[in-house]
Amino acid sequence: MAGVLLTGFEPFDGETVNPSWEVVKQLDGTMIAGQPVIARQLPCVFGEALSVLYAAIEDLQPRLVIAVGQAGGRVDISVERVAINVDDARIPDNKGQQPVDTPIVDGGPAAWFSTLPIKAIVSALRDRGIPASVSQTAGTFVCNHVMYGLLHKLQEQAGVRGGFIHIPWLPAQAAAHPGEPSMATATVREALETAIAVALRQSVDSKLGGGATH
């Protein structure tokens, strides 16, 4: 077991790019903390995204898996705490599927928590001057679908940790959405490199505040 599996998504909802893949693909083949990084693109499609992810996990046998997704409108790097066992799509996926109140895993737990050191990652990012926070919801679209499915899968992969990170739009995307926040590719790349390094060296999270009042 070795290496880091890093995933990003194809564009969706009318966008021509997805910042998660634009950044993740730059890290493919790099070394971080002595571990090779392998990037894979996931389709923005319920079910299919997990099929591609599971195949990559079986093929690569990574020690760490971090899925990355676009969260247009968010102002910072959002390190997700929890995924819930429901698909409730406000918009269709890239194959026109729009499940409503559908379990991701029939009979599965209501939620799975990230096994990344989420607060340590946020602290390290802030120390580098990168806006970051712990997020309490990954939504109910394909990102949450992938996060829940990933963590469910990892229950049978002893010693493998994983989680999900949401990132803002790129500046070029935000230009088409006046008033919306963005983050430069180079900053997001540094954030992901930092998150991977922290996750590789720290298996137990730091005891830091990171909750929300609402």
UniProtKB/Swiss-Prot annotation:
Where mainly located? cytoplasm
What domain of life is recorded for the organism?
A: Bacteria
Q: Which GO terms describe its cellular component?
A: cytosol
Which Gene3D superfamilies does UniProt cross-reference here?
Peptidase C15, pyroglutamyl peptidase I-like
Any idea which UniProt keywords this protein has?
Cytoplasm, Hydrolase, Protease, Thiol protease
Report the catalytic activity.
Release of an N-terminal pyroglutamyl group from a polypeptide, the second amino acid generally not being Pro
Query: Where is the catalytic site?
Result: E80, C143, H166
Quote any Pfam family the record assigns.
Answer: Peptidase_C15
Q: Does the keyword Protease apply?
A: yes
EC number per UniProt: 3.4.19.3
MF term (GO), any: pyroglutamyl-peptidase activity
Whether ATP-binding counts among this entry's keywords is no
Annotated compartments: Cytoplasm
CDD domains hit by this protein? Peptidase_C15
Where are the annotated coiled coils located?
none
Q: Which BP terms in the Gene Ontology apply to this protein? A: proteolysis
Tell me the enzyme class.
hydrolase
Q: Which family is this sequence assigned to?
A: Belongs to the peptidase C15 family.
Q: What is this protein's function?
A: Removes 5-oxoproline from various penultimate amino acid residues except L-proline.
Q: Subunit details for this protein?
A: Homotetramer.
Please identify the protein, giving its name as recorded: Pyrrolidone-carboxylate peptidase
What is this protein's gene name?
pcp
